[in-house]
């Protein structure tokens, strides 16, 4: 174990050395943009889908995180939320941490919505209901836990807290309250909080010292150390659902919401409010944020209630380049220049990320609907989960 | 110049350049349309109004400034027209004098909104059930009759294609003699219900106004958005929300206008006792109910469960008509299906034809409303019919509240020999709002 850790440190200099160089330790991956640069995996396979392992994790739409040979996610069953940790290679259950929780089936099946965060020997988890905890990654032992909603008095938004904890130095930055909340990651001690108003559903995204995320009525940027608000960009969306993470591209950022709202490219200006470059109705990301690759955005346009298309839009203009109909409210990641997408109906599709069209090299029906969770790629394994809690891991090595 | 004179001159002149502007103005004037309650469902209806090409969205009213702003954006996207925005529906009606008003507020507001809109001279499309209590519904009917305006109620299952064909099949005698009808809506769910904290209402929302004539409850996400359906101050639970659609179908099929006797049992054994204190609250509608409606020629049972909804039974929502030749299920997304009981009987089925994503038929109901406004027909879900249908779940709720069976005198619209139950035909209003008079 010690040897492996030191190898990983060396890996900073040479990624190929470490077995876990291509970990996916937090929501949206190592660089928080849905991109993995991992090479040497296959974009096509003959015959049946190459299943590495399968598991049942309960109801919900939590994504998977992968670090140092472990894979974790969450789900709900029998009156309890569960945080599950698996051996990434074999799928053996390393530990499970369960606690009483509500189903929360408000206009959908219910279950967990957020995603845990690995950092070193710890796993951090914020539940829909405000249960915030630090678990030992190796054992699942509770290092500390609390209910952050109760402690701060922040209201729980309609579908609960969904943003994953962001580790920043000694702090965990959370999308809780009007403009975030931070606790000490070692102890859970509250460091700063914001007004007791509804949070949005996105994960705090670091921009230097600032974290940017959606609240009920805008995207806000706050200083991560102090909680001081730098700016807010008014972004009124139906039911306060600002869920998609900001997508950073150069010095600009793309924000987008569903319910017909649309997207906008904003020019970032440090601690000054950003300036709108363009707006579009061509890409309205209700749940999963788009992914940026070589001048283009790829993402799902529309709501869970529709058979939404997968689209490519030009980041320079906001214009649509192509639209693949019937994709549904799934998600995608980009791995070494390839779109690795999981449709709302549970079909994996792999295609080169290109503005000229969506030409798949592989398509496999992994499970049934609803799969609203973007797939995760780490160390040659593709992690897919659906709302019912089927977790299917494909081996693309 | 009077219009008729103008027409004569225009005809005489015979030049196309002179005629052109006149031809354009001869197109029917667009109906100045307003929406009261600009949430999810209100916007769905307004979208159909805009899609009809005959309605100009002049104004929106909502007690939530955020909901107004979002709706205004969508209306502008769809129509290119910027509606005027109002917090107070009374001000909207007084200033805009709309031709048509859509009412999609929670149930406890339907009566006051509708009556005021009719007084302002508008035709009204109001959501089901008509009233929150029986006498509100009666007052709405009275106001509609006095105004001479068209009132269409959002009972889109009166016109939905598979309901129309299912009814035709049923009335053809193909199901035989029907002696019993079972209506139901089941969903999966868990218990006990955990209270949600009371909160400050969101910025921009006038919560006192939202509660209006109903008791002023503390704001909670249990209530808004959508959850008010299961809080009895504002609605009547699943029986009021879903039951009215299916009970309406029973009146349509049978031609009977009312049941003689009603008994309803139910409770919250799964969700647990209702909570309302200064810190938190739960919903308070029953998690299940069984209501028996005794008609002249058949018995009708309503049944809902907000737990244990799975595939044990083939259908989860809709109606079973039990006849001597078989069982007809008329459902929602699953269309209608006939299951014969006779040897050699043929199973028959027709798919639903619904508008997605929300599975309704508002588009054709709106078209029917416009035809009625044009004077070509009576609206298919008229206030007269919808009043009788809406009374049924409301009487079911009164039986459930009093814990005894009630007998309905439809001519007098009174419960026979039960003053305590009759008292529940109305309810006290919170001032300054005044209960409408019948």
Question: Residue ranges of each PLM-predicted region?
Answer:
Chain B
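Secondary-structure transition/capping motifs at alpha-helix termini
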Residues: 52, 81, 143-149, 172-176, ...
């Amino acid at each position: 174990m010690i040897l492996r850790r030191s190898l990983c440190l060396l890996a900073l200099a040479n990624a190929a050395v470490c077995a876990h160089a291509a970990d996916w330790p937090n929501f949206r991956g190592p660089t928080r943009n849905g991109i993995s640069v991992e090479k040497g995996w296959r974009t096509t396979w003959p015959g049946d889908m190459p299943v590495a392992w399968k598991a049942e994790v309960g109801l919900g739409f939590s994504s998977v995180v992968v670090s140092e040979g472990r894979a974790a996610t969450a789900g709900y069953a029998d009156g309890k939320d569960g945080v599950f940790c698996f051996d990434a290679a074999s799928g053996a259950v390393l530990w499970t941490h369960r606690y009483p929780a509500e189903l929360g089936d408000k206009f959908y099946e219910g279950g967990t919505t957020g995603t845990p965060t690995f950092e070193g020997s710890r796993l951090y988890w914020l539940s829909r209901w405000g249960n915030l905890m630090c678990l030992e990654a190796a054992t699942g032992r509770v290092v500390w836990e609390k209910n952050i909603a109760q402690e701060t008095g922040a209201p729980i938004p309609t579908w609960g807290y969904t943003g994953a904890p962001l580790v920043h130095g000694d702090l965990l930055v959370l999308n809780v309250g009007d403009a975030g909340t931070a606790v000490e990651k070692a102890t859970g001690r509250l460091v700063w909080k914001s007004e007791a108003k509804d949070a949005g559903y996105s994960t705090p995204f670091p921009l230097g010292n600032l974290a940017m995320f959606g609240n009920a009525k805008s995207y806000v940027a706050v200083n991560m150390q102090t909680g001081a608000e730098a700016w807010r960009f008014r972004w009124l969306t139906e039911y306060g659902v600002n869920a998609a993470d900001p997508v950073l591209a150069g010095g600009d950022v793309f924000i987008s919401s569903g319910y017909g709202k649309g997207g906008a490219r904003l020019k970032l200006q440090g601690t000054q409010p950003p300036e709108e470059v363009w707006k579009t109705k061509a890409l309205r990301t209700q749940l999963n944020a788009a992914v940026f690759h070589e001048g283009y955005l790829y993402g799902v346009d529309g709501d869970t209630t529709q058979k939404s298309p997968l689209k490519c839009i030009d980041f320079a203009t906001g214009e649509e380049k192509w639209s693949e109909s019937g994709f549904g409210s799934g998600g995608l990641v980009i791995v070494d220049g390839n779109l690795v997408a999981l449709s709302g109906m549970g079909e994996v599709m792999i295609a080169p990320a290109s503005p000229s069209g969506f030409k798949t090299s592989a398509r496999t029906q992994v499970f049934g609907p609803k799969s609203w969770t973007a797939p995760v790629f780490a160390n040659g394994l593709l992690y897919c989960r659906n709302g019912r809690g089927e977790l299917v891991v494909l081996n693309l090595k | 110049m009077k219009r008729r004179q103008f027409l004569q001159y225009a005809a005489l002149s015979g030049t196309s350049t002179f005629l052109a502007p006149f031809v354009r103005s001869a197109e029917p004037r667009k109906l100045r349309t307003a929406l009261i309650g600009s949430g999810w469902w209100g916007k769905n209806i307004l979208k159909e109004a805009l899609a009809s090409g005959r309605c100009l969205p002049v104004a929106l009213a909502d007690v939530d400034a955020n909901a107004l702003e979002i709706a205004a954006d969508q209306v502008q996207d769809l129509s290119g027209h910027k509606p005027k925005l109002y917090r107070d529906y009374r001000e909207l009606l007084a200033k805009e004098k709309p031709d048509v008003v859509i009412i999609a507020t929670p149930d406890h507001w339907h009566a006051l909104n509708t009556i005021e809109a009719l007084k302002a001279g508008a035709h009204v499309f109001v959501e089901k059930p008509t009233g929150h209590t029986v006498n509100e519904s009666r007052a709405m009917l009275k106001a509609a009759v006095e105004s001479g305006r068209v009132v269409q109620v959002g009972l889109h299952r009166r016109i939905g294609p598979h309901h129309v064909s299912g009814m035709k099949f049923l009335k053809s005698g193909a199901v035989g003699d029907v002696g019993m009808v079972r209506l139901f809506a089941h969903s999966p769910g868990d218990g006990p219900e955990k209270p949600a904290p009371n909160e400050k209402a969101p910025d921009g929302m006038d919560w006192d106004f939202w509660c209006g004539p109903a008791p002023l409850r503390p704001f909670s996400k249990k209530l808004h958005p959508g959850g008010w359906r299961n809080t009895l101050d504002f609605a009547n639970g699943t029986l009021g929300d879903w039951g009215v659609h299916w009970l309406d179908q029973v009146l349509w099929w049978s031609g009977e206008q009312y049941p003689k006797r009603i008994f309803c049992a139910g409770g919250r054994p799964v969700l647990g006792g209702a909570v309302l204190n200064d810190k938190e609250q739960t919903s308070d509608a029953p998690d299940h109910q069984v209501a028996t409606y005794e008609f002249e020629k058949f018995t009708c049972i309503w049944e809902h469960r907000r737990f244990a909804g799975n595939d044990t039974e083939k259908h989860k929502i809709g109606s079973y008509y039990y006849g001597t030749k078989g069982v007809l299920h008329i459902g929602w997304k699953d269309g209608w299906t006939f299951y014969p009981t006779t040897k050699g009987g043929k199973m028959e089925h027709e798919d639903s034809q619904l508008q997605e994503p929300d599975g309704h038929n508002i588009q054709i109901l709106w078209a029917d409303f416009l035809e009625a406004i044009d004077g070509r027909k009576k609206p298919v879900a008229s206030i007269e019919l919808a009043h009788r249908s809406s009374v049924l779940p409301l009487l079911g709720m009164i039986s459930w509240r009093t814990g005894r069976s009630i007998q309905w005198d439809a001519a007098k619209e009174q419960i026979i020999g039960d003053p305590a139950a009759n008292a529940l035909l109305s309810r006290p209003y919170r001032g300054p709002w005044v209960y409408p008079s019948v």
